[in-house]
């Protein structure tokens, strides 16, 4: 606050190591606990949104298990979000989950809570679709937006991560 900079959101840094989709309930609880700390931190930083990667689909965690486990955990987090007046914003990343805007809408809508929103990342989504289409469909479910560039051409020729190595307006974000 002394610098005049305003934080838009806080990121729960433990969502990759302690995913809410993990097969072990103890690990999921650690993920819940980390989210509670992040929500308390965001309030202290003067923002009202925390970024959350809700889960990871892989060989050990099926899509439906990721959906069900992460849903259960987020339902446990909603009362804390309500109490603190902060939003849990689900981000689209390369976690093999919520691969279409319709799935993302259904996921957010199931909570029936104004404290669960979507953290839309224009660059991340270019692997799965077109940002403008997702934005139109997600509509008022979007709580925050990450704006960054991504080049499909660079990703195709040099590896997926290389897609981020371009300046704004030089990639495929419309």
PLM feature spans:
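Structural motif corresponding to the early beta-alpha repeats
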Residues: 1-72, 87, 124
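Short capping/connector residues at structural and topological boundaries
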Residues: 25-26, 171-173
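Acidic/histidine-rich catalytic cores of soluble enzymes
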Residues: 10, 72-172
């Amino acid at each position: 606050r002394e610098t005049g900079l305003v934080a838009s959101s806080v990121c729960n840094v433990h969502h990759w190591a302690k995913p809410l989709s993990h097969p072990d309930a103890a690990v999921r609880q650690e993920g819940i606990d980390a989210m509670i700390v992040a929500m308390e931190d965001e309030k202290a930083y003067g923002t009202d949104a925390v970024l959350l990667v809700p889960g990871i689909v892989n060989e050990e965690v099926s899509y439906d298990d990721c959906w069900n486990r992460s849903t259960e955990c987020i339902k446990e987090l909603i009362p804390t979000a309500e109490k603190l007046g902060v939003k849990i914003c689900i981000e689209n990343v390369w976690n093999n989950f919520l691969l279409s805007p319709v799935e993302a809408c259904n996921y957010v809508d199931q909570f029936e809570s104004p404290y669960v929103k979507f953290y839309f990342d224009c660059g991340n989504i270019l692997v799965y679709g077109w940002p403008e289409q997702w934005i139109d469909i997600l509509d008022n479910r979007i709580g925050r937006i990450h704006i960054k560039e991504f080049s499909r051409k660079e990703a195709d020729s040099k590896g997926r991560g290389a897609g981020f190595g371009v300046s704004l307006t030089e990639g495929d974000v419309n």
